[in-house]
Structure formats: C-alpha cells, structure tokens
Amino acid sequence: MAGGTGSPAAIVLADAAASYGGRPVLTGIDLTVRVGERLALMGRSGAGKSTLIGLIHGQAPDRVALVPQAAALVRPLSVFHNVYMGRLDRRSTLHNLRNLVRPARRDVAAVEDVLGRVGLADQLWAKAGALSGGQQQRVSVARALYNGRPILVGDEPVSALDRQQGGRILAELARSHETLILALHDVALALAHTDRIVVLEAGRIVLDAPSAGLDPARLSPFYEAA
C-alpha cells in the first residue's frame, strides 16, 4: 500500500547537495519519502540519480537494503555465498567463517528460498562469475531480499532484464520491502510499479508527482537525450 501524508517519514533530505571533483552534481534537493511509498527516480544519464541514491542510502544505512548499479558480486564465490553476504553484519565472525567452508543447512535453505523468488534456485552453487549479466543482477537483487531491511534502495536494479522479467522482480521487491526507492530508466516499468515519480535534471528535482497522473508522453522528454 502506498504511503500517505500521514505515514511517518522513512527518508528526509533537506536542501541536500553533492559535488564530485569540485563540480556540483546535486543542488537544493528537498525530498521526503514516507513509509510505504514506491518511488521512482528518473532522468537522463548524468542527471544525478546515482549520487542521490548514495545520499539516500547514507541517511539510514541500518534500515536500507541496497541494490547497487553494478552487481558487485565476488565472482570466484558461489551464488549462495554472494547472497549470504546480505546478512554478514548480523552474524558472528565465527559463523561467517564456518559458512564459507561448510554452510549451515538453515542458511542454505533461506538463501535457496530467496533465489527461487528471482528464478535462480538452480544456480545456488554456481560461481557468480560464470553467470550472465542478467543472472548476476538477479543475484544482487536476491542479496538485498535476503538482507531484509525495510527500505529497498535500488540503482537501476532491473536494467539487464527484459521488461517482463523486470516487472516480476519489481513486484517481488514491492512485496518484500516496506518502502521502495528505485532509480529506473524504463518509463513503462516506473509507471506500472511505483506510485510516485521524481525526475532529476542537471542535479535538481524538476518533477515530483504521483505516477497515476503521469503517462509516457509526459516523461519521455526527460529521456530524449539519454
């Protein structure tokens, strides 16, 4: 269910700014995301979406499960171990070291369940580096699902998937997390799977509106130069 104005704030940015190499990347960002919202960040390449994702993650790292733009997998390790990393900080060092050599049955079962939700249960023991780009992206999503924190922040989490498969993954993320904040480039997916769209242009918010009141024609100009 979408978060309303009465829902508590999950993320608050007030006049936030960021620069890279002395060059402003984000300026005057005022953004409040409420518990229960499904928000899409959109805009051309270079508009500042990834930087904003970083600021949002930094606001509440202990409440955020992150799907980074690059899958960031440890390629020589198995899919199991890469997904298991989503909870490393909640397990003892001894348990984590033991799982590296002889994974506990309950952990294997939990990871296998999560992989089933992204269509990769049969890849549990495959090396992450042997997977296709789309499979690696789904492993990254599975790691965030396994992490289980209430706010899911994703930087193009389905960019390597076709629209149908991407839609299924976004629906699974919505079922599994209380609040979604997703940088997306696919207008159709954003309209179908979020309830609010925020568009960035040259580091500023130029549109912030309910998805229900928007359509592809309204959003496509922001992508013409993408």
State the predicted function of each range.
Residues 127-131, 135:
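Conserved ABC ATPase signature
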Residues 152-155:
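Catalytic Walker B motif of ABC-type/P-loop ATPase nucleotide-binding domains
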Residues 184-185:
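H-loop/switch region of ABC-family ATPase nucleotide-binding domains
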Residues 96-123:
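Conserved ABC ATPase "signature" region
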Residues 11, 26-28:
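Conserved structural motif at the start of ABC-family nucleotide-binding domains
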Residues 141:
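Hydrophobic anchor residue at the start of the ABC signature
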